[in-house]
A protein has these predicted regions:
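N-terminal intrinsically disordered/low-complexity leader segments
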Residues: 1-29, 173-174
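Hydrophobic alpha-helical connector segments
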Residues: 79, 93-125, 177-181
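Hydrophobic alpha-helical segments that form the core
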Residues: 4-6, 125-134, 157, 174-182
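Amphipathic alpha-helical packing segments from all-alpha helical-bundle domains
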Residues: 104-108, 141-167
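Short, basic, alpha-helical segments at the C-terminal edge of helix-turn-helix-like DNA-binding modules
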Residues: 82-88
């Protein structure tokens, strides 16, 4: 026997979607702040010398929270390196796109790079790619790919600067922008 809906069609209910309630306690950390602290640790000691206990202490997160937020230590390292690259690119992109004379652009680019390398709460931090990522790239193909991609992007940006300078007569016509960039 089939029961008929006793409610008239004009009075049909509409269901309003409700966001599911999160279970457990609210997050006691800010992911971007924690990632920044992990980045500082990895820059200081590299991947191998930075323990999960170090990361836990610096971020204020216990191990399960670290794993839940960022995955394992390698994934956290990769996310920290991606953050480093994104921050560096954001700091320099306008300079690379600027049409100032090449000398002034290069001076500004290297000034920003020095600010990135020499700033930090605990003193100079250096270049993350040179200091730690390059050594990790030897053993890890994913990190190697990221390092090579980052260097290729940088070479491409410098080549574009030199190409524009050559077009504006700031460099001789025989100057090869790609060679100068490398």
């Amino acid at each position: 026997m089939v029961q008929k809906n006793k409610r008239p069609a004009s009075r049909a209910r509409t269901v309003t979607p409700v966001a599911p309630k999160r279970r457990g306690r609210p997050r006691a950390y800010q992911p971007e702040v924690a990632l920044g602290k992990a980045l500082d640790l990895f820059r200081k000691g590299g991947f191998a010398a930075t323990s999960l206990d170090d990361l836990s202490a610096a971020t204020g997160m216990n191990r399960p929270s670290l794993y839940g937020a960022f995955g394992d230590k390698r994934e956290l390292y990769i996310k920290a390196y991606q953050r480093y690259r994104a921050d560096a690119a954001a700091a320099m992109i306008d300079i690379f796109r600027d049409e100032q004379p090449i000398r002034q652009r290069l001076e500004r680019i290297f000034a920003v790079a020095l600010d990135i390398y020499l700033s930090g709460d605990a003193g100079p931090r250096g270049c993350f790619t040179v200091m730690t990522a390059a050594s990790e790239a030897v053993a890890d193909p994913d990190i190697r790919g990221m390092v090579l991609e980052g260097l290729a992007e940088l070479d491409k940006a410098f080549a574009a600067c030199f190409r524009l300078a050559r077009q504006k007569g700031e460099l001789p016509a025989s100057a090869d922008p790609v060679v100068l960039a490398q």
